[in-house]
Amino acid sequence: MIIFTATLIIILAYFLGSISGSILICKTLHFKDPRQHGSKNPGTTNILRIINYKIAIFVLLFDSLKGAVPIWLGTYFHIDPIYLYIIAISACIGHIYPIYFQFYGGKGVATAFGALTAISINFFIIIIITWILTVYLFRYASLGSIVTFIVITFYVWYIQYHHFEYIILLSLIILSQHKNNIKRLWNHQEKHIWNR
């Protein structure tokens, strides 16, 4: 029964993750389509650049909840922790490859943030401190995300966090979505967080 419940939540997490906060909010409020403007990435940073910080905050909260809600649901049904990590991965894959938007989505950072925060407050603290500090020092949102998930990877490996391999897999998925950002950072072509 637990395995059946976990499987249903894993599937639900993908479909929930596929709902794009930026596209939905922009359509509802009649703002420009983030897929057609700026970096053309339907994520929080692009919304910050092409619209404003208030809408970006709503998108961040929406996309974070997509990761958190399935985890909370799994916790409510007392499923094994290993399934919680699979649920987190499923939600992020839904965000990155959304079935509702021709499998073209964001990078999964906010959704991963929500999922990991729902799993442990320690992840919340690490992510917030690392991201804010990195962006404050270097002014690149993408670098903040890259450094954050590298730190998460080493953290769970170093302390041998239970089922840490799933969290490392999640981090690698997020990092793989930043390959173009890494190239631009290397070539000094990446835009600062506030640059349009």
From Swiss-Prot:
Top-rank taxon, per record: Bacteria
Bilayer topology term: Multi-pass membrane protein
Keyword Protein biosynthesis: no
Transmembrane segment boundaries: 1-21, 55-75, 81-101, 118-138, 140-160
Catalytic activity: an acyl phosphate + sn-glycerol 3-phosphate = a 1-acyl-sn-glycero-3-phosphate + phosphate
Disulfide bonds: none
BP GO annotations: phospholipid biosynthetic process
The keyword Transmembrane helix is assigned to this record: yes
Pathway, per record: Lipid metabolism; phospholipid metabolism
Localization, UniProt: Cell inner membrane
GO cellular component: plasma membrane
Enzyme Commission no: 2.3.1.275
UniProt-listed PANTHER family: GLYCEROL-3-PHOSPHATE ACYLTRANSFERASE-RELATED, INNER MEMBRANE PROTEIN YGIH
NCBIfam families associated with the record: glycerol-3-phosphate 1-O-acyltransferase PlsY
Subunit structure: Probably interacts with PlsX.
Family membership noted in the UniProt record: Belongs to the PlsY family.
Function text: Catalyzes the transfer of an acyl group from acyl-phosphate (acyl-PO(4)) to glycerol-3-phosphate (G3P) to form lysophosphatidic acid (LPA). This enzyme utilizes acyl-phosphate as fatty acyl donor, but not acyl-CoA or acyl-ACP.
Name of the protein: Glycerol-3-phosphate acyltransferase
